[in-house]
């Protein structure tokens, strides 16, 4: 293994290769024992019998293996790193799922403590000093092992004593204890990313674990690969003289923009099943023993390094900033902590700019970099809102105390918003940069009136742009009257002399274009300017629309554009040197004269041969319009785009990207999802229908922004809360936002946040959750304007308590739906088994449901008999499940085929249970709604009957095991 420079990632151990490099002997045998247990750990975790596997390993370890491990680890740092990953992982796994306080098996703990004394530089320094003091000659591996274990145990005894005395250890001692109890989450630095099959094996290849852990390294690797670390290593010296180094710093800040933007896109693509994540990784990653550090947030060192470089918005003194960063980077390797310390103690660029002494160019370059950093934190804030779903799955604790909040969503939103204000100030939109704009007519009417124009912007400093991004433009329409609008970037021009890697989809550009229709005050102003004019701009990235491209010759990607929106695809194609597989570009326009960018379209159509197929569909073609296209390169036809899409999409289509108005985009989604000409009906689907949670949706939409009040439609039908409550199943999703009701059944097919976030509030009021993520987003308003179906009648009836009960029932049912829909439920295939979630997920789903239903029964005041029966039936089902999985482990663990089939039967039994519960709930909901609509109070016996049916379902499930 190589040696990492300050701030750089340490090399990844070659876990599978190491047995071939370790000399024969006890050390190699010990490594192979642990390596084999790691390979089987995920399979044992599936049925919750991992502790038996780990106990068997621990009983097979001893003094000889400890000394041998020390011997080979002292000779090879790569072996030491591998042992560190494996032993910390096994300790964390032993304590999962955190139902009670346990002690790590003795020999496993001893081996883990000793390897940490060798692996962690701070602990190693303590060990070396002790060994040198005890032995005049070179210490033997046995002496080193004994000293390491003795020092570690002394630290633990000291920590135990202070805890029993209700006092605290000195900070420097507690930091060393924290390193002794370093979690496997802390070892992601020396594990590969999620594509490495030998890393992050705590739960086999469970997506929620490998992506959460592995993305941390992949994000940091991207930041490092695109010069982020190399520039930060130079920053402390460059900041010593801002005046002399201003031009170098401007170039550095531009490169840091690109590095952060590419890392942000990788982080955005990290999607998970939140309930599964909450019951697996979130519980697994908590500290054990006397460690004072919990799991913490999911931010990698890039966040903290950029915090150190950019400082706080309030220019707080550097000592306070250093203390904060030191606290947040306690688990980082020493080299990363050293770089952070160097950055934060160097002269502050923010202070230099605030003093008024910075050059104009440096000020603009810093603002541009802050734009990307701000968006990075905004994206992190929105993704963190999904923690609420994980909490509902039964996670009982978080390091930040979110679970104790009355409203977790508001707690998370306020906490992260405060963090953003600390970094960017009270007005985070402030980091705009100056630009100069020119308007050029693109399309005119027969009378010469400008209908569409190209607006070109020259930026005062390079901005990081990817195809599909938008530009937030502030323009002074009248003296002192500034208006802000957001437009899609149609073309971007790289700065002179810049270069990019083959797979790089982001560049620092010096100028960009937008295409604007002459409608509305600001757009009309932009279109009709005769001379250049100053503006202020800010990039609005669109990571949800990032075009990934094909990776195989057999893959296809479909682009669908409406009119001038084709420019987004043309911009991406212009940046490609070659294409892999097939790309189909379908463009719709009224006629040839209304087809914007026709010249570029014709040019690009002949640039990639058979890899790019262009179709133009004209809805109202003029005479000779079809014949004007060059034969062979562009295929032209008449009609509506949706009438032709069935010919262009195939089962090999990897993803479909749609650009245009909201109505156009939704028509395309509807057409490709259901087939052209199909009338939309509420589908009869199971609440357990398949769901994809491991990747972004197939459809990626980039729609034109609407006005702020675009969803205010007249003559909307009145929809009661009772009717709303009946639409909370997959394929039939309604939500209320304020006083309006929306049918969002199509949204899961393109929602970047996944379907479970939508199901969370299906059939209920969702304004509070919506505002924390999408407030003020005009693009979302455009889509909602096409989905509004009525106005919510919020008047409370005579039996208002039953309306509250109904809302609670919907909430409970939504949780049950979310917790029971699993992408990789066992199928009986041994190849798929490693990606399946553990049986603990099923236990968590029923626990959450029973807890919620019991609360409903107590709230309704129907007596304790129903609650007692429900709890008793549930306990019987859990006990039967526990006994069954123990038997499966004992009888089938060594036979993967039988094991896979046994797991499938367990999950099938759970599916039958959930279907039965949903049937009972649906009938109860209909009864309540029918009675309330008729003006009668529902009978409490209906709750008794439903509860009895649910209890019976639980008892039948117990027998099925």
Curated annotation (Swiss-Prot):
It holds the Pfam family Cyt-b5. Keywords: FAD, Flavoprotein, Heme, Iron, Metal-binding, NAD, NADP, Oxidoreductase. It comes from Gibberella fujikuroi (strain CBS 195.34 / IMI 58289 / NRRL A-6831). This is Cytochrome b5-like reductase apf12. Apicidin F, like the other known apicidins, is a cyclic tetrapeptides with anti-malarial properties via histone deacetylase inhibitory activity. Residues 716-793 form the Cytochrome b5 heme-binding domain. Transmembrane segments: none annotated. SUPFAM superfamilies: Cytochrome b5-like heme/steroid binding domain, Ferredoxin reductase-like, C-terminal NADP-linked domain, Indolic compounds 2,3-dioxygenase-like, Riboflavin synthase domain-like. The gene is apf12. Its EC number is 1.-.-.-. FAD binds at residues 298, 753-755. InterPro entries: Cyt_B5-like_heme/steroid-bd, Cyt_B5-like_heme/steroid_sf, Cytochrome_b5/Flavoprotein_Rdt, FAD-bd_FR_type, FNR_nucleotide-bd, Riboflavin_synthase-like_b-brl, Trp/Indoleamine_2_3_dOase-like. NADP(+) binds at residues 453-456, 499-500, 753. Its cofactor is FAD. Pathway: Secondary metabolite biosynthesis. GO terms for cellular component: cytoplasm. Induction: Expression is positively regulated by the apicidin F cluster-specific transcription factor apf2 that binds to the eight-base-pair motif 5'-TGACGTGA-3' called the 'Api-box' that is found in all promoters of the apicidin F cluster except in the promoter region of apf2 itself.
């Amino acid at each position: 293994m190589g040696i990492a420079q300050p701030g750089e990632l340490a090399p990844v151990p070659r876990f599978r290769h190491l047995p071939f490099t370790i000399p024969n002997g006890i050390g190699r045998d010990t490594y192979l024992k642990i390596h084999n247990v790691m390979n089987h750990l995920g399979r044992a975790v599936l049925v919750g019998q991992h502790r038996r596997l780990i106990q068997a390993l621990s009983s097979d370890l001893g003094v000889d293996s400890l000394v041998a491990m020390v011997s080979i680890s002292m000779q090879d740092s790569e072996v030491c790193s591998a042992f560190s990953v494996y032993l910390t992982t096994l300790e964390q796994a032993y304590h999962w799922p955190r139902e009670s306080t346990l002690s790590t098996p003795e020999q496993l703990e001893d081996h883990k403590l000793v390897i940490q004394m060798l692996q962690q530089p701070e602990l190693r320094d303590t060990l070396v000093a002790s060994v040198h003091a005890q032995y005049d000659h070179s210490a033997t591996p046995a002496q080193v092992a004994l000293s390491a274990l003795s020092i570690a145990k002394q630290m633990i005894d000291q920590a135990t004593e202070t805890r029993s005395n209700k006092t605290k250890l000195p900070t420097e001692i507690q930091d060393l204890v924290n390193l002794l109890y370093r979690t496997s989450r802390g070892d992601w630095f020396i594990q590969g990313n999620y594509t490495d099959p030998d890393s992050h094996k705590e739960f086999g290849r469970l997506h929620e674990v490998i992506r959460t852990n592995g993305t941390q390294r992949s994000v940091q690797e991207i930041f490092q690969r695109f010069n982020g670390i190399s520039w930060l290593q130079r920053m402390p010296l460059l900041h010593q003289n801002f005046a002399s180094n201003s031009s170098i710093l401007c170039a550095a800040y531009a490169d840091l923009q690109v590095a952060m933007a590419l890392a942000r896109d990788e982080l955005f693509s990290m999607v998970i099943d939140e309930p599964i994540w909450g019951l697996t990784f979130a519980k697994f990653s908590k500290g054990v023993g006397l460690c004072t550090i919990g799991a913490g947030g999911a931010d990698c060192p890039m966040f903290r390094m950029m915090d150190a470089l950019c400082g706080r918005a309030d220019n707080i003194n550097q000592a306070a900033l250093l203390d904060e960063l030191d606290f947040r980077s306690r688990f980082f390797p020493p080299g990363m902590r050293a770089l952070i310390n160097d950055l934060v103690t160097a002269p502050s660029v923010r202070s230099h700019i605030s003093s008024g002494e910075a050059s104009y160019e440096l000020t603009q370059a810093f603002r541009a970099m802050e734009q990307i950093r701000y968006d990075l934190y905004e994206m992190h804030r929105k993704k963190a809102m999904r923690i609420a779903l994980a909490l509902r799955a039964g996670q009982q604790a978080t390091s930040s105390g979110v679970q104790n909040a009355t409203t977790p969503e508001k707690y998370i939103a306020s906490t992260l918003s405060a963090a953003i204000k600390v970094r960017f100030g009270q007005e985070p939109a402030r980091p705009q940069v100056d630009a100069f704009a020119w308007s050029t007519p693109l399309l005119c009417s027969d009378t010469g009136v400008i209908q569409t124009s190209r607006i070109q912007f020259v930026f005062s400093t390079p901005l990081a742009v990817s195809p599909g991004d938008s530009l937030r433009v502030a323009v002074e329409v009248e003296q002192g009257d500034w208006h802000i609008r957001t437009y899609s970037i149609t073309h971007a021009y790289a700065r002179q002399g810049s270069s990019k890697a083959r797979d790089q989809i982001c560049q620092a550009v010096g100028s960009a274009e937008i295409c604007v229709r002459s409608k509305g005050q600001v757009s009309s102003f932009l279109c009709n300017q005769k001379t250049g004019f100053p503006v202020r701009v800010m990039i609005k990235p669109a990571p949800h629309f990032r075009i990934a491209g094909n990776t195989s010759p057999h893959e296809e990607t479909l682009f669908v554009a409406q009119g001038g929106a084709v420019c987004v695809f043309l911009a991406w194609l212009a940046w490609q040197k070659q294409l892999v597989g097939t790309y189909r570009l379908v463009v719709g326009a009224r006629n040839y004269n209304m087809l914007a960018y026709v010249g570029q379209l014709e040019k690009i159509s002949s640039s990639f041969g058979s890899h790019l197929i262009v179709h133009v569909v004209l809805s109202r073609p003029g005479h000779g319009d079809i014949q004007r296209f060059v034969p062979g390169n562009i295929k032209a036809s008449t009609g509506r785009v949706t009438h032709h899409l069935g010919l262009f999409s195939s089962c090999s289509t990897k993803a479909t990207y749609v650009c245009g108005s909201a109505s156009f985009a939704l028509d395309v989604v509807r057409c490709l999802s259901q087939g052209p000409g199909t009338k939309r009906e509420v589908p009869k689907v199971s609440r357990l229908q398949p769901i994809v949670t491991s990747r972004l949706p197939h459809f990626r939409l980039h729609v034109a922004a609407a006005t702020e009040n675009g969803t205010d439609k007249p003559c909307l039908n009145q929809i009661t809360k009772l009717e709303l409550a009946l639409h909370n199943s997959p394929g039939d999703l309604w939500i209320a936002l304020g006083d309006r009701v929306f049918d969002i059944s199509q949204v899961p097919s393109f929602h970047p946040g996944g379907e479970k976030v939508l199901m969370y509030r299906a059939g209920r009021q969702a304004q509070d959750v919506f505002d924390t993520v999408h407030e003020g987003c005009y693009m979302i308003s455009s889509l909602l304007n096409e989905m509004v179906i009525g106005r919510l009648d919020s008047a409370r009836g005579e039996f208002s308590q039953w309306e509250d009960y109904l809302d609670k029932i919907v909430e409970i049912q939504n949780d049950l739906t979310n917790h029971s829909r699993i992408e990789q439920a066992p199928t009986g295939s041994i190849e798929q088994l490693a990606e399946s979630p553990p049986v603990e997920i099923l236990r968590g789903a029923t626990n959450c449901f029973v807890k919620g239903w019991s609360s409903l029964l107590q709230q309704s005041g129907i007596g304790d008999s129903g609650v007692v029966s429900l709890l008793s039936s549930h306990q019987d089902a859990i006990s039967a499940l526990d006994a069954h999985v123990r038997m499966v482990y004992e009888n089938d663990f060594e036979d993967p085929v039988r094991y896979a089939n046994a797991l499938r039967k367990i999950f099938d039994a759970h599916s039958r249970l959930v279907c039965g519960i949903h049937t009972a709930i649906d009938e109860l909901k209909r009864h309540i709604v029918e009675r309330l609509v008729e003006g009668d109070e529902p009978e409490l016996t209906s709750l008794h009957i439903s509860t009895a049916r649910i209890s019976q379902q639980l008892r039948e499930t117990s027998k099925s095991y």
